[in-house]
């Protein structure tokens, strides 16, 4: 799949200081690039109330992505540390 990066995603990853989280994110991006569909990626869950928005668990972090079936492009929206405020608007 082709990967695109949102400004929010780039900003959130620049602030990362956890080396393990950075390593896991890089590995996940490589998996996404090599995948044909999201079904090939483990820990993918659709976000309730949103069409085409998914979250992918990597340790204590969640990668929020936008993906439309039939489209080979995935937009990385945000990379968040999982806590009680993660999914609040």
Model-derived features: positions:
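A short, compositionally biased N-terminal segment around positions ~18-40 that is enriched
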Residues: 19-38, 67
